[in-house]
């Protein structure tokens, strides 16, 4: 069996493309989606996971481990953008941005690390953004959430 990969946000966009590439290279890929039953034509299995819900994260990681017996690679790809002048962005949207782009990936890492430590191997890739290295006009909250994830990744 190839290395087992879990990709958050694996049902569309960059996550789906990464998953398809790795699948064709022989990796055992599991993608995640908030609504996997709505996704058509995925070439790899999708498990239900909402990065804003810690229980959902723990269940999805546990399901992959129970199915495969291991977890070799986690790609924290799920993310959401937010734009606008700071004073016009509702606080709820700001919190949702941080829950999705920062706290969600932290919860995924917390759920995956015990298995990786047991295996004595594992790789976690956190997808950030150039916006995390410099503030972009009207993208301050997004930049802050990606910058926070970048710093945790480096630590």
PLM feature spans:
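A glycine-rich helix->loop->beta "capping" turn
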Residues: 63-76, 82
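Active-site helix of classical SDR
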Residues: 109, 145
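Conserved glycine-rich cofactor-binding loop
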Residues: 11-12
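Rossmann-fold cofactor-recognition segment
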Residues: 43-55
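Active-site loop immediately N-terminal to the catalytic Tyr-X3-Lys motif
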Residues: 87, 134-140
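Substrate-binding pocket helix/loop in short-chain dehydrogenase/reductase
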Residues: 85-86, 90-95
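Residue(s) in the substrate-gating loop at a strand-loop-helix junction
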Residues: 129
């Amino acid at each position: 069996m190839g290395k087992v990969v879990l990709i958050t946000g694996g049902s569309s966009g960059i996550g789906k493309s990464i998953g398809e590439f790795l699948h064709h290279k022989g990796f055992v890929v599991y993608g995640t989606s908030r609504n996997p039953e709505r996704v058509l034509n995925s070439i790899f299995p999708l498990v239900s996971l909402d990065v804003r819900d810690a229980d959902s994260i723990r269940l999805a990681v546990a399901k992959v481990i129970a199915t495969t017996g291991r977890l070799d690679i986690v790609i924290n790809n799920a993310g959401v953008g937010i734009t606008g002048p700071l004073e016009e962005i509702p606080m709820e949207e700001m919190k949702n941005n941080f829950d999705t782009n920062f706290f969600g990936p932290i919860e995924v890492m917390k759920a995956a690390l015990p298995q990786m430590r047991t295996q004595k191997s594992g790789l976690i890739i956190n997808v950030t953004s150039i916006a995390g290295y410099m503030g972009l006009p009207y993208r301050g909250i997004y930049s802050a959430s990606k910058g926070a994830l970048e710093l945790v990744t480096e630590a």
